[in-house]
Amino acid sequence: KLKVMKIIDCITYFDEPMLFELRLNILNDYVDNFIVCEARYTHAGKKKDLNFDIKRYKKFSNKITYIIVEDEPKNLIDYNSSNKSENVVFRINAQKRIYHQREKIFFELKKNYDSNDWIIYSDSDEIPNLMDFNLKTCKNKVVLFNQLLFYYKTHH
C-alpha cells in the first residue's frame, strides 16, 4: 500500500517565538508536520532553560513535534588537551553541538516518516516560499530555494 507523501518542516529552536509563529503561518497550508528541536545547551556549551512553549501555538499544536536535546555531544574537544587555539576549539565544538541537534531531528524523521516524504530543513528565519512550488509533484531528490533576504530587528 502506497503511503501518502508528507511534507515536514524542521528547525532547531533557540528563542525566536515571533519568528517561529511567522514561519508556522506562512508554511501551514503547505506542510503536514513541523519538527522543532531545542537543546538544553547553547552552541557555546552554556546550560540554558527551554524557551519553546507549545501553548503559544495552539492553532498548530497538532502538527508540531517538539524534541528536547538533554545531552551534549560525546565527541567535544577539551580546551586543555587540544593543541588548537581556544577560538578554533570553540567553533568546532559549536558545530558539533549543532550537528548533534540536527541528528536528533534525523532520528525522529527516520522513526516516523517515509523515504518518499519531503523534508525541509532550514534556520527559523530561512522560510521557503512554497506558494508557487508543489513539492508533491516534484521529481527531484533535492531542491534548493532562492530566498529574499531581509534585515530586521524585532522589539519584544
Label for each model-derived stretch:
Residues 95, 126-156:
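Conserved catalytic core of nucleotide-sugar-dependent glycosyltransferases
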Residues 41-118:
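Active-site-proximal specificity loops/subdomain of glycosyltransferases
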Residues 7, 64, 142:
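Short, conserved active-site loop motifs that form the nucleotide-linked donor/cofactor pocket
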Residues 18-19, 42-46, 74-77, 127-131, ...:
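Short catalytic/ligand-binding loop motif for oxyanion handling, primarily in non-cytosolic enzymes
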Residues 31, 61, 116, 139-140:
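Short, well-ordered alpha-helix to beta-strand connector turns
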Residues 35-39:
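Short internal beta-strands
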Residues 34, 113-128, 133:
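Short beta-strand-to-loop acidic/aromatic patch adjacent to the donor-nucleotide binding site
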Residues 2-29:
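N-proximal low-complexity "stem/linker" segments adjacent to membrane-targeting elements
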